């Protein structure tokens, strides 16, 4: 049985992501144990690692040393001051500023994904699949090839980024119903 470590860094509800991982594993008939942990050794030993997207960039960075969420993969972020990121994907986390001033921040709700390139984690998703977003900042990715999918909210932004064995989503897979469960199942069965 493989282990999925869901990192508990003290910043939110982990029940929803844990249940989504369990449902996706059952749906793809994969044998996974979901372990909610803050133990670095357990994270290192896990077959897969998930960092839920809860909290501000600066708060997450302070409480975490090894495994990034999508925005922590950046070189830095500007939420609550300038904070150094892990630098695994070139770019910076900046305030989401839609061109249309009537659009509210945070961007909260359903939005279409525009798949930019094929990736195993997005395999089988229908064209223009919808995902659920809640965010006020976006990852301004430097290299277009690191953007797997984008969405638009008064201008395009990176919705899924990835390189090598790293993948991150701006949206909440656990709240994105069919799209989210498919993505999580693909993540669980993805072999690098």
Curated annotation (Swiss-Prot):
Pathway note: Amino-acid biosynthesis; L-histidine biosynthesis; L-histidine from 5-phospho-alpha-D-ribose 1-diphosphate: step 5/9
Keyword Hydrolase on entry: yes
Cellular compartments annotated: Cytoplasm
Chief location bin: cytoplasm
Record SUPFAM superfamilies: Class I glutamine amidotransferase-like
Catalyzed reactions per annotation: 5-[(5-phospho-1-deoxy-D-ribulos-1-ylimino)methylamino]-1-(5-phospho-beta-D-ribosyl)imidazole-4-carboxamide + L-glutamine = D-erythro-1-(imidazol-4-yl)glycerol 3-phosphate + 5-amino-1-(5-phospho-beta-D-ribosyl)imidazole-4-carboxamide + L-glutamate + H(+); L-glutamine + H2O = L-glutamate + NH4(+)
Swiss-Prot/TrEMBL keywords: Amino-acid biosynthesis, Cytoplasm, Glutamine amidotransferase, Histidine biosynthesis, Hydrolase, Lyase
Domain Glutamine amidotransferase type-1: 3-192
One GO term describing the cellular component: cytoplasm
UniProt xrefs under Gene3D superfamilies: 3.40.50.880
Subunit structure: Heterodimer of HisH and HisF.
Entry keyword Hydrolase: yes
PANTHER family: IMIDAZOLE GLYCEROL PHOSPHATE SYNTHASE SUBUNIT HISH (PTHR42701:SF1)
Gene Ontology biological process terms in this record: L-histidine biosynthetic process
Active-site positions on this chain: 172, 174
EC code(s) of this entry: 4.3.2.10, 3.5.1.2
Name of protein: Imidazole glycerol phosphate synthase subunit HisH
GO MF assignments: glutaminase activity; imidazoleglycerol-phosphate synthase activity; lyase activity
A Pfam match: GATase
Functional summary from the UniProt entry: IGPS catalyzes the conversion of PRFAR and glutamine to IGP, AICAR and glutamate. The HisH subunit catalyzes the hydrolysis of glutamine to glutamate and ammonia as part of the synthesis of IGP and AICAR. The resulting ammonia molecule is channeled to the active site of HisF.
